[in-house]
Amino acid sequence: MTKKRKLKPRVIAIAGFAPDSRDQVNEEPDTSEIWAINNAYLFLKRTPNRWFQLHPPDWKRNEGMPAGSYGREPEHLELLKESPCPVYMQVKTPDIPSSVEYPLGDLVERFGRTYFTSTMAYIMALILAEHDDGQNVGEVRVYGINLTTMNEYFRQKACFEYWIGQAEGRGIKVWVPASSGLLKAGLYAREAVSDDVVTMTEERCEAWRQR
């Protein structure tokens, strides 16, 4: 009887847009999968394996972005239409042949939690679902994602870190760059927190309360 060949664990690199580490994703070997968000094509040197554009078509219309371009410049829509890789979207879109509806309902039912405050959270949940279904993932590498701007810090960072914890709980290694603000903080009751960090946090909290 022929032995079934054991596949090597998958390595998935998430390509975000923060400039301090995003270009490092281009150093990934061809064996790594690249899962890219929004307009990461501006710096990627190869076609990603999957692309995620999970915003509504008229996102940021009130900020001057053109209608139907998903909150980006007009050429963004054209690139979506021409994408050779699957493009995960809220719904399958006829004008974008490679579009795939993101399976939100299935993932909420599977994980029993409706907690997705960023594209990165959606991505990590999909990775976990595939891993749980036997498509073994050994490592996730996170490039270009800091989540330290006002909105990201308060609304998105904790959620993405929650899903990172879910991955690590399954034995999946998660790597983040030293420059990223993810998974970093002083030890409670053991390390002094700098006044600069305290001031910054207080200012952010006050601004958040006044919204």
Language-model regions, residue ranges each:
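Metal-ion/cofactor- or nucleotide/acyl-coenzyme-handling active-site neighborhoods
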Residues: 1-211
